Amino acid sequence: MRFILYACFFLSGMAGLIYQVVWSKYFNLFLGATSYSTAILLSTFMGGLALGNHIFGKFVDRIRNPLRLYSFLEFGIGIACALFPLYFDLLFNLYFIVARGSIPNTTGNIILKIIFSIFTILVPTTLMGGTLPVMSKFIIKQIQEVGAKVGLLYFLNTVGAILGTLIGGYFIIHTLGIDFSMQLFSFVNLLIGVVTYYLSKRVSEDYTLSEEDAEKREEGYPKYTDTQVRIVLMMIGVSGFVSMVYEVVWTRMLALIIGSAVQSFAIMLFTFITGIAIGSYVIHRLIGRLKDHLFAFAVSEFLIAVTVIVVLPLYMRLPYYFNIIGGVIPRTDSMFPVYEFGKIIICFIAMFLPTFFIGMTLPLASHINTRSISRLGVGIGDTFSINTLGNLIGSFVAGFIFLPTIGMETSMKVGILMNMGIAVVLFFYTSIHRYIKVLVSLSLVISVIWLSLYQFIDKEYIQRGNFRVRQRFARSFEEFKKLKDQERLVFYKEGKGSLVTVTKSEKGTLSLRINGKPDASTGFDMPTQIWCGHIGVLLHENPEDVFLLGMGSGVTGGVLATHKEVKNIELAEISKEVIEAAELFKEKNYDVLHNPKVKIINADGREYLRLNPQKKYDIIISEPSNPWMAGVANLFTVQYFEEVKRHLKENGLFVQWFQAYETNDRILNIMFNTFGKVFEYAYVFAPAHLDLLIVGSDKPITLNRERIIKKFLDPEFLSTVKDKDNKGIPDTVEKFVSMNLIGDKKYQIYYGRGDEDLLVNEDKFPIIEYEAPRAFFVGRTSDIIFSIAETNMSYNYSSLFTKPLIKDSFKRMGMNEIIDFIKSSEIRGQKIVSRSGFAFIMDNNLDRENIYVINNHPDLLAYYTFIENYPSEKDSYSKDKCLTLIGIIKKYTDSTTSIFYSSQSPKMLSHIDNCIELHSDLYANKDVWKIYFTLGLSDKLKRLYENLPNQTGIDEKDRIEMLSYLIKHYYYIEDFEGLNSLLPQIDTSRFKDPEVIRILKEVRGSEKKG
């Protein structure tokens, strides 16, 4: 029977943690994705557990059959969770009726949220809280067994929670949805209820004991005084408080190191409770041999502080270790579990030792507090209840007071000192020698002094977001740390929900990071930030009222405000710190924070719309674009798009920013299909390489020729797109048209009514949030939209232009020689319609009302298409043609993503081989050297080097540059034999490249030491 009960308790812990994970998804819909919402969920959850510990701990001491009560608890949990999706929807709708018109996160709004949260999960969580004291009452027969058996039950329940963390974080939510997940695992509790009820009928023993029986079972048990017990209860509450301070700080810090994907948070929780589980198991095995449990409790608290201190110096090395892990793992789908295991290693380094000793504290405190077998339920229940209340207060104080005011580092130091303080207090109530008490007190004083002097978090270093780096780029930790010197930290603010930083590069480029993830900048992001604000205004006939979700750098909001026809802008930003940081971007965002047109709302934008159904807008813009980050994917669901649609005026437009990088075709298809379920008509634009802007409406979108051309003639408008620091911003009518990838008609064919064969992303079926991190890990780009843009189909642009924009735009890339081929293909109906390109109207009797967009825009995909289509005949490789071709290939390989494409472009290398074969002097062409270096082609570089002596008339500067490529290549692939073979022929003084000089000094230095 006992084995079956242990199995039931294990499964109960698993189901409980799955419920917690699933409830967090419900609460995000209900309360918004804010730190207040997370705090309310934790408070309600832990409050319910504490209440259950206390109520059922008292109640179980008065009943004859604890196992039957346990079965009723499991029945209650199962029924409540099975019905949860039904009554959640009722309360969800009721909340938005009652809270209508309120501002999110004001005092009244938060009180309402707390009230409704209590109604949603207080019943099942209270029942969950009762399971441990009730099961303990049934399992424990002797008072001497309390600590050991509580430790075992705690271990089993926690191991179940570990399994629940993995199931909830990786498997069920995106495959079953949150409603079905809830109902499915409710059957686990119902099954446990059935099994334990059946077993309870076989129990004949009366668990209400007489005083005589109780005294027999308590013989030989060490008695602690009332004062000692009160101190232990007080200290276990403080210990619970400190444990949650650590967890909150670790979660914030580790998110900066391993990223903010939903799986990353599951791994952090997995590691935290694994340490607790192992600690509780070890104390379960040891507790029977201990003579003084109060002393053991004090030592555990002392060791928590010591182990946190021990791992402090490692925290700043964790990004370096994770870079090593991420740099050696191949970026394929099949290796994603290995990458996640790498995250576990990082989290274990940070958390395991302290959580191991945290796991010992509750069994020890329960053992001390339970002084009578007849009051066993009260003893265990009160211990767990007080500890859980400490958890509740600790999570709230850490998230809302400590992090925003004193930051991660000081919060951790406060936790260490509190653990030391707990240990000192407990030691003074033990019978140990006073010299030991003095030593422990002295250690507290030393800790205070040491912690006040030692700084273990380097702000510039920790905020860099190294989890995005896909290759190892430093050979040592010291070299890795120096990379931070490339940027200067100009803003650092820890808030309730995130760490927000702004850095400035040597060139003056500002970058905004949220939890380490670059979110906006005055560099590469500018084209998309600017056009995100412009594009809706250009396509709407009378855009007076605009709602913008997301501040970022403030550039989009500032650009919007420059349009005279735009009268009112409401800008919702969830992070107060991001709003503050936008002040640093005032030169680029037109001082948006102080623009009278702009109303800044510090709230969850989606919740704000839901609470204000009466508000209508001409344009709504949604800027967040990284669905792999936890919480952001809520802005890419059918229900969110429907909410947006309800807030659009007639002929209103919705602009959504999405990226085609760090994703895959499946995710992009799901996203567009989800969008198409709500918005039947849309245009897709690409203002920058792999950044997409989708403009949707429930009515056909008309491109007004006169309005667009008039805008481009407006000096004020032109001043916003002609940025002296960013030459790549589309700033002409031609470039505006070239941004368009998919027009209205083609969009309708592919996505306009939602393809039934494709999945959609829903609030209660969040596919993207769970699949996007895998695509982010692989790090590829999706070209599905570009492929659709290239399909053999011409489409009409509503007669936007009636005469050619650029008669022969191929001249921009030296492609004149294949113009005739393209034209003849068009005439034969083999349309080459674009990824992104300049629009022009073909001659040769083509319909002049249609604009054909072809592959002639100078970006990666256009070059790739040109290289693939370049003819391989011998007469295509004249010297001049080869030089042009090699120049195009070099530009292509200089792209950050070109290596991915090169594996699919064998023609590229064959073109170079053919040119070199026909023109041997190309062995000394530095562009060829650069191409082979970029692609890491050792054999090709060696071949060039071997033939270099045969070349005459080489400019010495070019020769040095070519050798530099070979030196760096050998060094990067760690071919030191090849590098040493070059040394006798190299005069270091001739090289100007700092990296090459450093390499040569390092290698020659190693040679001398050898």
Regions found by a protein language model. Give the residues of each.
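Residues that mark the junctions of alpha-helical repeat units in TPR/alpha-solenoid scaffolds
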Residues: 878-881, 885, 921, 959
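TPR repeat positional signature
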Residues: 818, 882-885, 892, 925, ...
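Alpha-helical repeat scaffolds
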Residues: 834-841, 848-854, 860-878, 885, ...
